[in-house]
Regions:
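Carboxylate-rich, polar loop motifs that coordinate divalent cations or form catalytic acidic clusters
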Residues: 1-246
């Protein structure tokens, strides 16, 4: 960890229980290096927290089942919401902590099963209105307003069975531009833009050559950058179409 003057390397971990979770504005959060890490205790799903003094490994208040060892492995960036809570996206659940309580949105919470499809979270983003967007590889996009969760993909009728073409089912990146439009990067279905009323799909004909959009990054000036693969490329939207920058 670099504090602006020197680099500190932490080889030993402090393993705190879930009862010792705490939250402050200056916390740094890190994904575990492996499912099992350097110590058997790291086999319990959780995250590293640096509080300015020490690095600790904090376990999530969840129970893993045999064969689901990676179910609660971190799969997204961390999101610090406007109300102060921190959100962790794992493959099988969205876990939020507000300093005292946990919110766990998983298959059981949503009533999902083999027939409906399961959570497979690949991206999370909080928009300027405080809505949390959850991108999945399979069941599409979920939207959480702090009280209820809706399947946004189903609401917009953007499942493959509805569109017979490009869908909003495999979403790996989400971003919001300075105008409040929400953008979704997909696998093999280009980029979708939601302006609050309708959806628009951008593909190769719009200058987007990459089939997979893995990352949407927002600069300090509010510009969105889109990182893709197959083929690799970095793009920006000029208001009408995408321009490849790299």
């Amino acid at each position: 960890i670099y504090d602006g003057q020197k680099m500190s390397i932490y080889k030993e971990r402090n393993y705190d229980s879930t009862k010792q979770w705490k939250l402050s504005d200056s916390d740094l959060w890190f994904k575990a290096d492996e499912t099992a890490g350097y110590n058997k205790l790291e086999g319990n799903p959780g995250v590293y927290q640096y509080d300015g003094t020490k690095l600790s490994y904090l376990t999530f208040p969840v129970k893993t089942k045999l064969g689901q060892e990676n179910h609660y492995s971190i799969s997204t960036n961390f999101v610090r919401s406007k109300n102060g809570a921190v959100w962790f996206g794992t493959y099988g659940a969205l876990i939020g902590y507000n300093g005292s309580d946990f919110t766990i949105i998983n298959d059981s919470y949503l009533g999902l099963n083999d027939e409906t499809g399961h959570l497979h979270i690949r991206s999370i983003m909080e928009d300027s209105k405080g809505n949390l967007w959850i991108g999945n590889n399979g069941i599409g996009v979920l939207k959480y307003d702090g009280e209820k969760v809706i399947n946004f993909t189903e609401q917009q009728k953007l499942k493959k069975e509805d569109t017979k073409g490009n869908s909003l089912e495999r979403v790996f990146s989400i971003g919001e531009d300075r105008l409040g439009n929400v953008w979704f990067g997909t696998v093999e279905s280009g980029v979708w833009r939601y302006d609050g009323n309708s959806m628009k799909n951008f593909t190769k004909k719009d200058g987007l050559e990459s089939k997979h959009i893995w990352k949407i990054y927002k600069s300090k000036k509010g510009a969105l950058w889109f990182g893709g693969a197959s083929p690799s490329g970095v793009y920006q939207f000029n208001g009408n179409s995408f321009e490849r920058k790299y």
